[in-house]
Amino acid sequence: MHIVLDTNILVSAAWSPGRNASAILEAVFSRKHTPCYDARILAEYDRVLHYPKLKFTEWEINAILEPLVKYGLSVIPEPLLSVPFERDETDRKFYEVAKFCRAVLITGNLAHFPSEPDIMSPADFCRKYL
């Protein structure tokens, strides 16, 4: 199954081993699910994981990003400008990639996205697919 991970899922997985977000990342690393991304998403992952307040080491960041790239699907999605993103326009990229790949979008910020069946919380994804 193709999935798109909002950045908060990566941060949660690194901060909270043994919880839903880390179970999702483990499923990606074991190739049960294929992460989809584009250059904008990778840039955000890299930028956020390097925030000084998160205190992740370069090794930890690489341990997260390298398998995502290695096992993932890099795409160039079509813009979907007809869908409003009033809360956070920067989240549009995740939605565009998810729609392009027909993927499930997993986020801790459901309010930032349209209410659609393939956009779900980590808990809902784990309950349904893991």
Annotated model-derived regions:
Residues 19, 36, 56-59, 85, ...:
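Residues at secondary-structure transition points
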Residues 102-130:
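Acidic, PIN/NYN-like endoribonuclease modules and their adjacent C-terminal/linker elements
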Residues 2:
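Hydrophobic "anchor" residues on beta-strands that sit immediately upstream
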Residues 39-69, 124, 128-130:
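Extended, non-globular alpha-helical segments
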Residues 70-108:
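Active-site neighborhoods of divalent-metal-dependent phosphate/nucleic-acid chemistry enzymes
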Residues 30-32, 71, 101, 116:
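Structured helix-beta-strand junction loops
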Residues 5, 15, 21-52:
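PIN/NYN-family metal-dependent endoribonuclease catalytic core
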